[in-house]
Amino acid sequence: MERASERSRVARDVAPLARASRPDDVIHSFSIESSPFVVTSSLVIARASTRAPTMKFGNRAIISPSLLSCDFARMADESRKVIECGADWLHLDVMDGHFVPNLTFGAPVLASLRPHVPEAYFDVHLMVSNPRDYVEPMAKVKTNMFTFHVEACAGEADVETLCAEVRKAGMEVGVAIKPGTSAESVCAFVDKGLVDMVLVMTVEPGFGGQKFNPECAKKAATLRAKFPDLKIQVDGGLAPSTIEVAAEAGANVIVAGSSVFGSEDWTRAIDTLRAGVKKFNE
């Protein structure tokens, strides 16, 4: 009952942000911290130029199970199985042990996996200090979505240059923001058409199985209010008990690890997540 009450409170908090009183409302936050991209989340509504209605966007619900939670010894088999169970994308967390403390897999593992799932959509989340070094290797393994952290870049010009390099290499561009980074820090890149997706982390990146941080969902609401047709991905602690908070805020691309791979019925787990997104976004 206590968790249900907390979920209801957060949903009430987030819903007004995602459904701002006017279509041209934009949500801004202030209180700047040390990083050029990090801003805390004191929320203020500000008027912007004409925008489309906030929650009427054309992107369908996309479920991207994280292979960080699969059995690494059976990665190919479990990748095939999770696709058969209804997964839209495969989420691959590449960590270098420097940008985040954990170390996972890189291009050689993805190259080995690709022949087993030749048609799969590789949704690669790079938690690395030098994402530019990964553009060519990830393109070679036919990565579809190349998502890097703005916190790993020196500034806006560096982000824009990297976005262009990723596009030139034939991949879609995703930018990720950690819990301490504001949604506003990536708006300029979306406005300029440089970005296909924004990944909002709802846990600190680096390890799977963490608890969902509902305050981070407000950033999805900020982005959805400004960009009705943007792919907004949420990653961290997503499960049937938290999916509706993220979906009502505007997330339509859902990363789920343990809630899928730790379930006895992967099809049912994926269907439940998809239904949670569709409830608010279709």
Residue ranges and their predicted role:
Residues 54-141, 153-156, 173, 187-194, ...:
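Conserved N-terminal beta1-alpha1 strand-loop-helix module at the mouth
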Residues 75, 93, 138, 198, ...:
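Conserved, mostly hydrophobic/aromatic
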Residues 148-153, 202-208, 250-269:
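Glycine-rich phosphate-binding active-site loops on the catalytic face of alpha/beta enzymes
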Residues 262-282:
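C-terminal helical cap(s) of enzyme catalytic domains, especially alpha/beta-barrels
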